[in-house]
């Protein structure tokens, strides 16, 4: 056990899908996994283990933002020996290259958070995903006929009051969307010699002001869940 996860050692499989929302974790477990079992519930941050097409896989919530995400990622790696961590979440698009319902594979993550500078002795850390996981995601998307969008994301500490005047600059540097965790996830996995990747489904477009309905959000997220489970199976 850890201060934030009350699962037993051995409850987590080496591969784990991460979601910010613990209710989404429960949804995935009930809809997509066989023999799903709740293994942790501290602070109502739920975790499950089960089978997908006969292969063991775990699910874990991580809350919102880099600080919360890195707590869970650190404990999963150091205490529960999780080797591959795949975050699946939503994001707000800032580039004309992507639209609503698109799935983005974050090949790099910039951030306005200071956490990686503290971690890397005030130098700029290149927060990037594991290549092998990225390749598997790309190849699986091709097999499933999913037009996976590939590019950078910006992990912000702010959900509200973000610097909207910076959107054009970010898009110029091939940043496709804004989310809140990838930079911390990648840095933690790099530090602890584990594999991580972030996939994000576009739920809102911050430039065009388009947004998915609640029903559309579920449907588009299901496509990403299937992609994530297939690439891990």
UniProtKB/Swiss-Prot annotation:
Annotated site residues (Important for catalytic activity) in this chain: 217
Top-level division of the source organism's lineage: Bacteria
Any one GO MF annotation of this record: purine-nucleoside phosphorylase activity
InterPro entries reported in the protein's UniProt record: DeoD-type (IPR004402), Nucleoside_phosphorylase_CS (IPR018016), Nucleoside_phosphorylase_d (IPR000845), Nucleoside_phosphorylase_sf (IPR035994)
Keyword match Glycosyltransferase: yes
Membrane-traversing stretches: none
SUPFAM superfamilies: Purine and uridine phosphorylases (SSF53167)
Annotated catalytic residues: 204
The family this protein is said to belong to: Belongs to the PNP/UDP phosphorylase family.
Listed NCBIfam families: deoD, PRK05819.1
Protein name per UniProt: Purine nucleoside phosphorylase DeoD-type
Organism: Helicobacter pylori (strain P12)
